[in-house]
Amino acid sequence: MTDQQNTEAAEAQGPQFSLQRIYVRDLSFEAPKSPAIFRQEWTPSVALDLNTRQKALEGDFHEVVLTLSVTVKNGEEVAFIAEVQQAGIFLIQGLDEASMSHTLGAFCPNILFPYARETLDSLVTRGSFPALMLAPVNFDALYAQELQRMQQEGSSTVQ
C-alpha cells in the first residue's frame, strides 16, 4: 500500500486513538530538613504546580508530558519537594485541529494523571513522609481556561 492509500484508509475508518506507552520521564525528591523534620509536629501545607506539554513525534505519534511538582512545608520549613514527569506516547489520527488540540491538552493528561499521582505518592512514602493523596484534576476545565486566555490574547493555538 502507498502512503496515500494508508492515509485514505485511516480517514475511511474515522478518528483513531491509541496509547502506545506510559513512562516516567523524570523523577526527583528532596527532603532538605531530614532527619530533624521527622521529630517535629506534622502540620503540613501543600503547594502543587501542574504543567503539561506535548511534542509531535514521527508520523501520527505524539508525546505528552504531565509534570506534577509538590512542595510541602511543615510550618515555615520545607519538608520535601517532589516532582514527577509522567509521559505517554499516543498514536492519534484523523482529528481536526481543534479536536487534536483538546485531545493533547486535556484527554491525554487525564490518562496520565493517575499514574503520576501514584508515582508521586510512592516517592513521598518512600521518603518516610505520610501519603500524599492528590485530588482528581479536571483537565477539561483547565484546557478551557487556557483556551479562553489564549483567545483573549489573540492566539488560536493552545500550548
Swiss-Prot record:
Q: Which SUPFAM superfamilies match?
A: SecB-like
* One cellular component term from this protein's GO annotations in UniProt: cytoplasm
> Where would you say this protein principally sits, based on its record?
cytoplasm
Tell me where in or outside the cell this protein is found. Answer: Cytoplasm
Pfam families from the xrefs?
Answer: SecB
Q: One GO molecular function term?
A: unfolded protein binding
Q: Which domain of life is it from?
A: Bacteria
Q: Where are the transmembrane segments?
A: none
Instruction: Output one GO BP term.
Output: protein transport
Which UniProt keywords are given for this protein, alphabetically ordered? Chaperone, Cytoplasm, Protein transport, Translocation, Transport
Quaternary structure and partners = Homotetramer, a dimer of dimers. One homotetramer interacts with 1 SecA dimer.
Q: Which family does it belong to?
A: Belongs to the SecB family.
Please state what the protein is called. Protein-export protein SecB
Q: What is the lineage of its organism?
A: Bacteria, Pseudomonadati, Pseudomonadota, Gammaproteobacteria, Pseudomonadales
